[in-house]
């Protein structure tokens, strides 16, 4: 992890297209501005985690609807034990 120190008004660059600027500091909160192309998603971590969770649930539901989680054993063999 790269650790940087920036003052209000200073900017750091991520690649050629993303800039992060410190807008203000108030108590233990830091306001930052992110300037990135529209095709690059920028989320707070808790929002990103919720999106990932929702995608996982949605994917699992699609697999269930398609029968992907059906038992892999032969029904006749299973019930004739």
Curated annotation (Swiss-Prot):
InterPro entries: CsrA (IPR003751), CsrA_sf (IPR036107). This is Translational regulator CsrA. NCBIfam families: csrA, PRK01712.1. GO terms for molecular function: mRNA 5'-UTR binding. Belongs to the CsrA/RsmA family. It is found in: Cytoplasm. The lineage of its organism: Bacteria, Pseudomonadati, Pseudomonadota, Gammaproteobacteria, Moraxellales. The gene is csrA. Pfam families: CsrA (PF02599). The keyword Repressor applies. HAMAP family: CsrA (MF_00167). One of its GO terms (cellular component) is cytosol. Keywords: Activator, Cytoplasm, Repressor, RNA-binding, Translation regulation. Homodimer; the beta-strands of each monomer intercalate to form a hydrophobic core, while the alpha-helices form wings that extend away from the core.
């Amino acid at each position: 992890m790269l650790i940087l120190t920036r003052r209000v008004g200073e900017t750091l660059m991520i690649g050629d297209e993303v800039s992060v600027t410190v807008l203000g500091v108030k108590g233990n909160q830091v306001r930052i501005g992110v300037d990135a192309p529209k095709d690059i998603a920028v989320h707070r971590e808790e929002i990103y985690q919720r999106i990932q969770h929702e995608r996982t649930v949605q994917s699992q539901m699609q697999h269930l609807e398609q029968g992907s989680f059906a038992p892999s054993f032969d029904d006749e063999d299973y019930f004739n034990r």
